[in-house]
Structures are given as C-alpha cells and as structure tokens.
C-alpha cells in the first residue's frame, strides 16, 4: 500500500512539474526565415509571428473591410479576386503565410489576405482587383522545391472577417 501511495505521489509531482514547464501559449517564437516579396498590387509576407497576429485579430477593425469574391488556381498561379469600397487614395493588400504545410493528403496550407486603405472618401461604388500569386516563384523557392506544395490545397482567409457560417474561408486546389 505504501508503495502505491509513493508512486502516486511521484506521478503527481512529475505531472505537475511537466505542466508548469510546458510552453506558454502566448510565448512568441521568432520566425527563423521571414520573407517579403513586393509585387505589383500586393505584398507577400512569409512570417509566422505576423500570421499569428492576423489570425488572432482578424476583424473589420484590424483589416480594412473587403470581400474575397473568388479564388482560382490556374496552372501555377492562384488568382484571388477581391472587391472593396471605392474612394480610397491607397489600397494595399498583404498576403500572409506562416510557412506551415499540414501533413495531410492532399497537403494543406493557409493564407490570409489583409487590406490597408488610406485617405478614404465615403462611396457606394466598389472596386475590383485580382491578386495573382505565382506559386512556383514564391512557394517552391521558399520551400526548396517542396513537391507537396504542387498538390496542396490553399485555404484563403479574409483578415477583415471572423469565420462563421456566412464568412467561410475559401479552399482552392489544383484540381
């Protein structure tokens, strides 16, 4: 009986000490290889810290509102069609990736699209823009030719909206 109690105490002590030394959910892990690529109508950022910030804060207050109208994968490009209120002097889009490819079949990865607008006048009209991502240029170079990305499903998320039944994230595959 003493032996059972002794092992129970040891087990409890080990469990508690492991729980106290485990990683804190808010601990910031630095991205070892952040990457920024400026394109004609968007900026592509591979940055896990920024990705987590966007994921945590996604809302109309965090990203200026816009809609993702359509996402298509055409050959080695992804076309993200967005619409947003007209009347802004500047509309900058960021495509944010954390660099993670989920090991599933087919593999999956997630992207956020964020809009920053400036000098806006109220308007009922909408502008449309297509953000064309050259997947080979960005992902294959970053992942040293990782063949998994050729077949990956990309889940594209709007940083100005929280996901719910009417605002689902949009998956797109090469099929």
Language-model segments: residues:
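Short beta-strand segments
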Residues: 91, 129-131, 163-168
């Amino acid at each position: 009986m003493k032996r059972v109690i002794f092992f129970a105490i040891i087990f409890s002590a080990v469990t508690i000490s492991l729980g106290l030394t485990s990683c804190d959910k808010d601990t910031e892990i630095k991205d070892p290889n952040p990457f920024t690529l400026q394109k004609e109508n968007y900026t592509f950022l591979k940055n896990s810290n920024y990705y987590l910030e966007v994921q945590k804060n996604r809302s109309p207050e965090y990203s200026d509102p816009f809609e993702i109208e359509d996402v298509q994968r055409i050959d080695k490009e992804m076309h993200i069609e967005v619409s947003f209120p007209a009347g802004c002097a500047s509309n900058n889009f960021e495509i944010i990736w954390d660099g993670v490819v989920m090991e599933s079949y087919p593999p999956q990865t997630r992207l956020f699209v964020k809009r920053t607008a400036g000098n806006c006048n109220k308007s009922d009209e909408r502008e449309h823009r297509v953000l064309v991502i050259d997947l080979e240029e960005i992902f294959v170079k970053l992942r040293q030719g990782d063949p998994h990305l050729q077949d990956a499903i990309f889940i594209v998320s709007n940083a100005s909206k929280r996901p719910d039944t009417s605002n689902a994230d949009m998956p797109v595959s090469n099929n």
